[in-house]
């Protein structure tokens, strides 16, 4: 294999640039040319493709976002869109592709593989919801962003003796809510993977208030429901002054943590190795601090599950 491509797709996550850097430098080290595909699968279909040199990925390891940009591309879900993408890859002499993104990006890589084009998926999403890996690129950075916000919110919650509801990202996966809530000492954590009893939440808040606790932090994953609605229900049921903070897209930005930079570097380099070994249709991940790879179709057939032990611990510690 003499020429490979790399693209980022779907929602951006801190550390994607570090992964791009690793792909480019690892490939060039082995005498392989690398072409960057801009704006994800949409850019692939449009032929927005450019050769990348070592200098093109200099001074990006610390930057959030993605220098290749990213976009959603409904057209690539169609057979016609996939064939257009393969035509562009062949036109540029690209023999293998590294796809950095979430489950939707993996679906695109799987389709290309089914058409006979070798692809390797690299997990890049703040949601940490990709099967086959303990952590995804960007999760740790997003987690630290949320923790920083929780710490600041707790300061003002304490000063004003208020209850705060903090809504975080996670439509289908509660990892951000669970990990940040546990690390931030939240009184209640609501995640999509677990049922909750609003009456029980209200009762626990009242019990805490009766024993002298004048402020509380509640973390709500967006997939559970609107933080604004939860805040309204809590204030109406308890009479406690309640405020709501929706963190939103700030969770996707910022300079990646050291953990995410190292993880992205390891995963990006391994993705190149797999292509050079002639192994397409794979996705890389980290499990027990070891870099692993799986069949991408098998990984997509599985469902990410939140760590129930951590969820149980969070409830035990929030009495």
Swiss-Prot record:
It catalyses: beta-D-fructose 6-phosphate + ATP = beta-D-fructose 1,6-bisphosphate + ADP + H(+). One of its GO terms (molecular function) is 6-phosphofructokinase activity. Substrate binds at residues 125-127, 162, 169-171, 222, 243, 249-252. Its main location: cytoplasm. ADP binds at residues 21-25, 154, 185-187, 211, 213-215. Its cofactor is Mg(2+). InterPro entries: ATP_PFK, ATP_PFK_prok-type, PFKA_ATP_prok, Phosphofructokinase_CS, Phosphofructokinase_dom, PKF_sf. The keyword Ribonucleoprotein does not apply. It comes from the Bacteria. GO terms for biological process: canonical glycolysis; fructose 1,6-bisphosphate metabolic process; fructose 6-phosphate metabolic process. It is found in: Cytoplasm. It holds the Pfam family PFK. GO terms for cellular component: 6-phosphofructokinase complex. CDD domains: Bacterial_PFK. Its EC number is 2.7.1.11. Allosterically activated by ADP and other diphosphonucleosides, and allosterically inhibited by phosphoenolpyruvate. Pathway: Carbohydrate degradation; glycolysis; D-glyceraldehyde 3-phosphate and glycerone phosphate from D-glucose: step 3/4. Mg(2+) binds at residue 103. ATP binds at residues 11, 72-73, 102-105. Keywords: Allosteric enzyme, ATP-binding, Cytoplasm, Glycolysis, Kinase, Magnesium, Metal-binding, Nucleotide-binding, Transferase. Catalyzes the phosphorylation of D-fructose 6-phosphate to fructose 1,6-bisphosphate by ATP, the first committing step of glycolysis. PANTHER family: ATP-DEPENDENT 6-PHOSPHOFRUCTOKINASE, PHOSPHOFRUCTOKINASE. Belongs to the phosphofructokinase type A (PFKA) family. ATP-dependent PFK group I subfamily. Prokaryotic clade 'B1' sub-subfamily. This is ATP-dependent 6-phosphofructokinase. The gene is pfkA.
């Amino acid at each position: 294999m003499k020429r490979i491509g790399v693209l980022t797709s779907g929602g951006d996550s801190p550390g994607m640039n570090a992964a791009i850097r690793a792909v480019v430098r690892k490939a060039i080290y082995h005498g392989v040319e690398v072409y960057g595909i801009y704006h994800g699968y949409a850019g692939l279909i449009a032929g927005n493709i450019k050769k990348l040199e070592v200098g093109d990925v200099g001074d990006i390891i610390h930057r959030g976002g993605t220098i290749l940009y990213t976009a959603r591309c409904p057209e690539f879900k169609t057979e016609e869109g996939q064939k257009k993408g393969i035509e562009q890859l062949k036109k540029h002499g690209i023999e293998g592709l590294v796809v950095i993104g979430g489950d939707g990006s993996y679906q695109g890589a799987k389709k290309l593989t089914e058409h006979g084009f070798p692809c390797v998926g690299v997990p890049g999403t703040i949601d940490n919801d990709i099967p086959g890996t303990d952590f995804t690129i960007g999760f740790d950075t997003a987690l630290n962003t949320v923790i920083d916000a929780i710490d600041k919110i707790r300061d003002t919650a304490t000063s004003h003796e208020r209850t705060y509801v903090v809504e975080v990202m996670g439509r289908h996966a509660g990892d951000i809510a669970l990990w940040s809530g546990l690390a931030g000492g939240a009184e209640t954590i609501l995640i999509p993977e677990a049922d909750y009893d609003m009456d029980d939440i209200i009762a626990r808040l009242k019990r805490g208030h009766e024993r002298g606790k004048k402020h509380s932090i509640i973390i709500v994953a967006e997939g559970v429901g609107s933080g604004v609605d939860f805040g309204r229900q809590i204030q109406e049921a308890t009479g406690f002054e309640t405020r709501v903070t929706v963190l939103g897209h700030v969770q996707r930005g910022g300079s990646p943590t050291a953990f995410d930079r190292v993880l992205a570097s390891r995963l990006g380099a391994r993705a190149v190795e797999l292509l050079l070994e002639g192994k397409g249709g794979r996705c890389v991940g980290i499990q027990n601090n070891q870099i692993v790879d799986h069949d991408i179709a098998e990984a997509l057939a599985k469902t990410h599950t939140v760590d129930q032990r951590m969820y149980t611990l969070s409830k035990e510690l929030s009495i």
